[in-house]
């Protein structure tokens, strides 16, 4: 395990981040710096390359246009509340999304392969800045670590120094 730096009785927060990333890499997650994820703007949170790669590899019987429709559904998902949006994506991750194959037959497309875990793309990402609007004001967040499965962020991790009494959640 990575050795944490102790400076005047305090540990350096980036060491916690590096230790977590190293641990996840040993468990098979692939590290990716958030700045290297291609996206149209900082409001985008998906890793489109991984999502497209997974869907294309897992669904050879789908036309590219149908795969793009699924990607667009995930990318443009929306609902009345943030909770409803998260619930919709969660349901898609568990149950899949309805699609139509090349024979014009209905099929269910999984966003995660629960049967063969090795078919999934696991990424641990840091240095990923996200822009959003809150009450009409543009804001940014840069979580310490994000976990992606097949291009979809499934976990946001904020690491805090337990010895720092002035630590905030942001």
Describe each PLM feature range.
Residues 1-170:
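An alpha-helical interface "stripe"
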